[in-house]
Amino acid sequence: MKSIIKHILFVVLLISIIHDSQCRWFILKNRLSHFINRISELKEQDSREAKLYKSFDIDCGKNFLKVQQNSKMLVNEEEELVFKVASSLKCSSEDAAFKFYFDEIIRPKLKKGLSCFELHLQQQEPDSKLIKNAIITKAEVEKCKKQSPIDDLKEVENGLEDVIGPLDVFSCGAVTSVDDYVLFVTKSVLIKFGESSEAVKKVEMEKLKEYLKDIAFTTAECIFKRFETDPKGTWFIFVGYVARF
């Protein structure tokens, strides 16, 4: 399960160790332009990487690039990666990028802990339609108390907080606590494997898509602003993709 959680935390991309460097915008602009052009090529292919970018809006990406071109924030490859991730999320207007998340990251093994995710959502949002038909036995409750994927999620995410500090500060309020992240993964798993209707899953998935985009882009902007005031600092960014059904 821990290995699965680590894969989920691909959703949580870490960018670290920002080295001393002067702004090299024109070099980066060429690389970022190449990145956008490369996506155009990938959209015509059927590779694993192409699946991630099938939904990328090229015009949106070019406009996002223009917004950053007079900035002193993009100073090296780490910041460049922030741009790529943020623009990919901001400019993905369809569902392919979100489908990639579950197809490539969340594996069916998570289904083994489904009752624990149902129990967690029942405790956090008892009126959620995702658990309307869920039946959790006493035996399952006891099993979840002893060993739950929720505990693994909290353990890994708490370790991340030990490194980057409080999530609410790091993300400029986009995420208020580890519990927000755990709740997001919980809903994602129940949308993928739960027993609720397809209509309910569709509505809940749209909510998660917007939630993830808001988190990713708000956090990216937060990181960009930090680069302006503390370009020598060590920073991280977490982003992720959610599937479509």
From Swiss-Prot:
Tissue: Salivary gland.
UniProt KW Secreted keyword: yes
Record-listed Phosphoserine modification sites: S33, S40, S92, S93, S115
Signal peptide: 1-16
Subcellular location(s) of the protein: Secreted
Record keywords: Phosphoprotein, Secreted, Signal
Main localization category: secreted
GO cellular component: extracellular region
Role noted for this protein: Used by the larvae to construct a supramolecular structure, the larval tube.
Protein name from the UniProt record: Balbiani ring A 28 kDa protein
Biological source species: Chironomus thummi thummi
